[in-house]
A protein has these predicted regions:
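Short N-terminal segments immediately surrounding and downstream of signal-peptide cleavage
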Residues: 23-39
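Bacterial N-terminal signal peptides
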Residues: 8-17
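Conserved anchor residues at repeat-unit boundaries in beta-strand-based tandem repeats, strongest
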Residues: 37-48, 60-71, 83-93, 106-117, ...
Length: 343
């Protein structure tokens, strides 16, 4: 062996321990084929410990590594401007962490394999706040969403859509509690308004629709069919003073066949049009008189017969609730008059 060869061997042996020590703890820089640059500690030739990895597309990770893998606590800057700080596994956010998006929105909570998954809190750029369960970055499970305007939803979610059972509080103080389908009130639910109005019953596409009970602030209560928020179909109203109406409704008014019963003994059964007594019907007055015939604008109008408590009768023409025109009257003493009447 020549002196030159010997000197070369001694030099290599002297340098080898230094190289090994650098790879197993000292900070080093290394550039990879994809253009990425790593600066940090190594173990047995791979990233291990702490280090920073930068890619040409703007991605940057600083934090813990384990046997060549991003694993542990760290901070990642993504090309789109988002920044994630938290736990990593297999190079992806996993465990607990917080991401701040380029638009200022944030999410802090649980992650799985790079996806927002589990429990967390999201603050969106538009001011909306959501706290609850997530699946693949979408609201899923149970959660509470609040908007800056005062709207709040608390309940079930499916793939980012309100679905299931929930409670909605509106900015004006109204509260809905019940079924939600595809983000709208559908199914069975209760609405309570600030002025005291309440509704319990069926909903469809966000509106009162179906069978339900509607109680007005003044105490009037309606039980029956409703369509698009209005009384429509068959139902019963119990008024605050004890009067009742049972029968047909159309466009939120008494329309069709129905019976009105007053606490004073007044009873009408017959036809209604646009909320008024109109058409054929029969009324029993508080004094016991009974009229049967035609009506218009809530009054006897046209042809009809009235029988009084003393047995006297009138059968003939009426105008606006007054006997007027041709008719026949019978009196208790047996007198009969047939002819024309006025007032």
């Amino acid at each position: 062996m020549t002196k030159t060869s010997l000197r070369y061997l001694i030099l290599c042996l002297a340098l080898f321990p230094l190289s090994a020590r650098a790879q197993d703890g000292d900070v080093q820089s290394k550039q990879y084929d994809d253009g990425g640059v790593y600066e940090g500690t190594f173990k047995e030739g791979v990233q291990h410990g702490t280090g920073t990895y930068t890619l040409p597309n703007g991605y940057k990770y600083s934090g813990e590594w384990f046997e060549g893998e991003i694993k542990g606590e760290g901070v990642a800057h993504f090309p789109n401007g988002s920044v994630y700080e938290g736990n990593f596994s297999k190079g992806k956010p996993d465990g607990l962490g917080k991401i701040t998006f380029a638009d200022g929105g944030t999410y802090e909570g649980e992650w799985q394999a790079g996806a927002i998954m589990g429990q967390g809190i999201a603050l969106y750029a538009n001011g909306v706040r959501y706290e609850g369960s997530f699946r693949n970055a979408k609201h899923h499970g149970k959660g509470v969403m609040q908007s800056p305007g005062g709207y709040e939803y608390k309940g079930d979610w499916v793939d980012g859509v309100k679905q299931g059972i929930g409670t909605i509080t509106y900015p004006d103080g109204a509260v809905y509690d019940g079924d939600i389908i595809d983000g709208t009130r559908s199914g069975t639910g209760t609405l309570t308004m600030p002025d005291g109005l309440t509704y319990v019953g069926l909903w469809k596409d966000g509106q009162i629709d179906g069978v339900g009970t509607l109680t007005q602030p003044n105490g009037d209560t309606y039980e029956g069919d409703l369509v698009a928020g209005q009384r429509h179909g068959t139902g019963r109203v119990t008024y605050a003073n004890g009067d009742t109406y049972e029968g047909a409704f159309k466009d939120d008014r008494r329309d069709g066949q129905g019976t009105f019963t007053g606490t004073d003994g007044y009873i009408y059964t017959g036809s209604w049009v646009a909320g008024q007594i109109e058409g054929e019907g029969q009324v029993t007055y508080p004094d016991g008189s009974v009229y049967k015939g035609t009506f218009r604008n809530d009054l006897a109008n046209g042809k009809g017969k009235i029988t009084y408590p003393d047995g006297s009768t009138y059968d003939g023409q009426w105008v606006d609730g007054i006997i007027e025109g041709d008719g026949r009257a019978t009196y208790p003493n047996g007198v009969v008059y047939e002819g024309s009447f006025k007032n």
